[in-house]
Amino acid sequence: NLLALSIGSERKYIPNADVNTSFAGTYWNSDFIFPNSSNVKVTETELRPLSLAEMRIARNEIFARHGRQFKDPMLNKWFYSKAWYLKINTKYSPADFDALPDQMNAIEKANIAFILKTEQNRMKNQTIFPDASTRVLSEYDVSLSKDVLKKALNEIYTAEKVPVGQKTTLSKVALKNVEQIEGILNTSEVKY
């Protein structure tokens, strides 16, 4: 069973088994994080329990409703797993979407700005992965910018009370997360 991803004119197939369902199980089996974000303003109360990765998906699902595809393969994998996204006949590469006349209504624009501001505030003022010593992070969790992942890496060492780079004294879960983040930081691929 394959999941088809079309990015611009390129079509790729990913085995469904490779689609990570451990991330936000609540959301994997539902259609939207915020089903009404096209016509109802998202509130701080609704964003508070979400992780950075969940907020990123919630923000990008507004774009996805208009057929936008993404440079980040994780976002494409996420949205191509949703029946509503598969039903959109015309999908646009990021460049083609950006060249279109404005697609968003005022509520969508406000929600995008509010979610992004909340993400930025959380990145500055809160621990990125407060449970990184007790839970293995999924590929969706770590699908963040390299700057955010560098901060998260330092936070994991701090939470474990271990000097940065002293991997041998990290807990098994923290070590797995550190290695996963370091692997991303050592690639040239840019997440945003």
Q: Which sequence ranges carry the predicted segments?
A:
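Intrinsically disordered, low-complexity linker/propeptide segments enriched in Ser/Thr/Gly/Pro
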Residues: 2-10, 14, 127-192
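Stable alpha-helical elements in mature extracytoplasmic
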Residues: 51-59, 111, 145, 149, ...
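Extracytoplasmic/periplasmic, Sec-exported soluble proteins
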Residues: 47-54, 71, 107, 141-145, ...
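Second-shell loop/turn segments in exported
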Residues: 41-49, 65-66, 100-102, 137-138
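Amphipathic alpha-helical packing elements
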Residues: 46-87
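Zn2+-dependent metallopeptidase catalytic domains
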Residues: 15-40, 63-70, 74-76, 131, ...
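Compact alpha-helical subdomains of small soluble proteins
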Residues: 70-125, 171, 179-192
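Sec/Tat-exported extracytoplasmic proteins
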Residues: 59-66, 119-122, 156, 160, ...
